[in-house]
Every structure is written in C-alpha cells, then in structure tokens.
C-alpha cells in the first residue's frame, strides 16, 4: 500500500509541473530565457578559458623541451670542451718535460741521426756544432812520435807551423837526462790546421821519419795507431757505449797506491768503476789498471794527453778495447795485445829503455827488430866478450861451463835470436869455434847454429835475468 501511495504521489507531482509551466507569465519566460543565455555564456567562457589554459600548457611544455635540449647541448659542449682542455693539458705536460731527459735514453746513433737531420735543415744548428767542435781540443790536438833525442819544442813549431796557427806546442823531455822522450804534442787554434797537418801523417823532422795522429786516439805501437790493434775485435764492442767510457792505463807499478790513482784520474770526470785489474791478494796494481767513467766525455778528456806523469812513473792511457779472451800462450797477460808489446811490459827502468822500449816512442832500429827483445846488447861489448872468451879463455883458465853459461845468459838477456843475432852482427850467432881453442871444447863440435843446449848443472838460455822471460820478454806477473 505504501509503495502504491508513493507512486501515485510522484505522478501527481509530474502532472503539476507542466501545469505550473503553463501558468507562467510572459515576463517570467523572458527572465528565464535571459538566465539561460547567461548560463550559456558562462559555459562558453569556461570552455574558452580551458582552451587557453591548454594552449598555455602546450607552450610551456614546448619551452621546457627546448630548455632541456639546450641544457643537453650545453652539457655535451661542456664535456667536449673539458675533454679538449684535459687533452691540451696533457700535451702541455709532455711539452714541459726537459729535452735532456728525453735524450738520455737515446743511443749514440739516435742522437747523431737527430743532430745530423737538424743540422741539414737548420743552418744555425750546423754553425753551433762547428763552434763546439772548434772549442774542443779533441779535434785540434796532434800527437807526434818517432822524434830524435835532440828534438826541441822549437823544432816541432818550425815543422808544423806551415799547416796553421799553433796555440800550444810541447816536446816531452826526460826530467833527469833532459833529452827528448821521442814524442810531443801540437795544439792548433782551429780544426783546419790539424786537418792539414794530418793529410800527410808521415813527416821527416830532423834526421828521423816521424808519424802523427789525433791525440784523442791514444798511444801508438810499432808505428801504427792503437786503432789498428782493434781490427780483430768485433766492431760492436768498440762502438758500444760502455767501451766509450773505459780507459786502459799501462805501466802502473805495484808500488802505486790505488786510491791516489783514483784521485788522480778523477780530475777528468766522475769515475763509475776503478781502478780495476788489481791483484786480488795484495790489492796492488799488476802493471795496468782500468777506469770506467760516468760519461764518454770524461774519458775523452782523460785521453787528450795519453802519457801522464804520476809519482815518477809515465802512465800510458788509451781507450780500452774489449777484444777476445787471451789463449793459452797469453793466459798470464791480461791484455790480448800486450804479449809482444813493449809498452805493456812492466819494467823497473822507467823511461830509460833503448829505442823501441816502453819508455820511449821512437822508431826502433831495424837491426834490433828481429825478435821480441827486451834489451839490445851493444855490438861492441858482445864482440869484445866473444873475442875474449874465444882467444883468451885458456890463458885465463875459464871454466868451459861458466863460459858457455855466460854466453847463454848474455844471449837471453839481450833477446838474441840465434838465427839472426839481434843487436849484434849476424855472424856471431852462427860462427863456429875451432876445437882446441878453449880447454874443454875440443871434444865438442863447434858452436854451429848458435849456442848449444846446456849440459846438466850448467846455466843456459832457458834461464835469463830476473824479470826477463826465456825469450827476452819481461815478466809481467800474474
């Protein structure tokens, strides 16, 4: 029932509304139309505002996107700029590294190649290289050897001044005798003077034929530069950097103090190793020593004057040569070129040996060059002694054994080669002695072919003087 009543009430209300609308006056209808128009205008304004807001939002979104793109572009630009800045910074760091530090690891060949290329492209570099070469005495100092005993400094100046202006000249003399030691030095003011003088290395000065070379090449042996002795050594050894810094010093007596030697050679530059080659038991020199400098320039300075006076000894310096190890015949000689070389032989008679001996750089007498001699006997003395023993032996009651031993020892000390009689006429090495001339020799054949092998109990040619080997070569020591 209740539901039915509600439905009826709703129907009655709906029926009343149209009736009320019909009962509205024209004025009310007009007002209603105006209200509807106002409401419609408000709706249109709201819609227009919404459209404007949407357009503004779209513009703002576009602006935000543009700003984002600009920020991204700016970020990328900053990154590129930062990378470029860091790259240039690293390059500047590389450029700031000192040139000397860059060149130190380079080999000599690399530095020479760079300098040559730079000199070919830049004239100022070539001029600077020439200036440095002119200042360095290595290219201007000449060593001359084979001079006579009476050669003076004035003689050298007169002989070499024709090649260029001389800055300094010195003929080396013995302090005691006052005679020339057979060599000297000439320092020119320019490289051209030294080059002109070396165009003809052999020169006749006085009555002697001399030879000259750059002093930086070191001493000479037998008239040939020391460089010739290195022919058998591999080329890579002589060109190695270590070899360029090492010098060899000969004629170093055992009485010399190694520490004083080190101080003496340190004035040419810092020494890395040395003195090397000392006796492992006594700690003293064995006739030679080696020094290794920190740089090759220091070694060159030490070799500018190859012959140095130290505590009364003449030390002979040269560039060390790393040659092959000595064989059995040279096992007691620490330098492979020293076996037949008088300059390497230790001799207590410093600087007073005969021509060809270690104390002088004179051209040896060809008559005394037949064998490896240590001393050359005066022919007059040998002839007198031989004649005395041959003709007066019986009258003086000489013991034959003593006579033979005397002749044998003289032959050994003089380095006499029985085949050629070094230092005396050839006939004295091979002449025969008639039987009966000397008592006790009648039962022996003549001294055919030289001195006979000594009998038991007799002295012979195998026993020489103290410090002299069986063939006349001075004893080097172990």
Curated annotation (Swiss-Prot):
Q: Where is this region: Disordered?
A: 1-99, 321-359, 442-478
Task: Mark out the compositionally biased spans (Low complexity).
Answer: 442-456
Induction record:
By wounding.
Q: Which GO terms describe its cellular component?
A: nucleus
Q: Which gene encodes it?
A: UBA2A
Q: Give a short account of what the protein does.
A: Heterogeneous nuclear ribonucleoprotein (hnRNP)-like protein that acts as a component of a complex regulating the turnover of mRNAs in the nucleus. Binds with high affinity to RNA molecules that contain U-rich sequences in 3'-UTRs. May function in complex with UBP1 and contribute to the stabilization of mRNAs in the nucleus. However, unlike UBP1, UBA2A does not stimulate pre-mRNA splicing.
The name of this protein is UBP1-associated protein 2A
Which UniProt keyword terms apply here?
Nucleus, Repeat, RNA-binding
Keyword Transport listed: no
What would be one Pfam family of this protein?
Answer: RRM_1
Q: State the remark under miscellaneous.
A: Plants over-expressing UB2A1 display severe growth defects consisting of premature cell death and chlorosis.
InterPro entries from the entry? Nucleotide-bd_a/b_plait_sf, RBD_domain_sf, RRM_dom
Subunit comment for this entry?
A: Interacts with UBA1A, UBA2A, UBP1A, UBP1B, UBP1C and SRK2E.
Question: Which one of the record's GO molecular function terms can you name?
Answer: mRNA binding
Principal location listed in the UniProt entry? nucleus
| Bias (Gly residues) ranges | 457-470
- Key word RNA-binding present in the record? yes
Tissue pattern of expression reads: Expressed in young leaves, flowers and embryos.
This protein's source sits in the domain of life called: Eukaryota
Q: Where is the composition biased (Acidic residues)?
A: 41-75
Intracellular or extracellular location(s): Nucleus
Tell me the ranges covered by the RRM domain, including all copies. 140-217, 245-328
A single GO BP? cell death
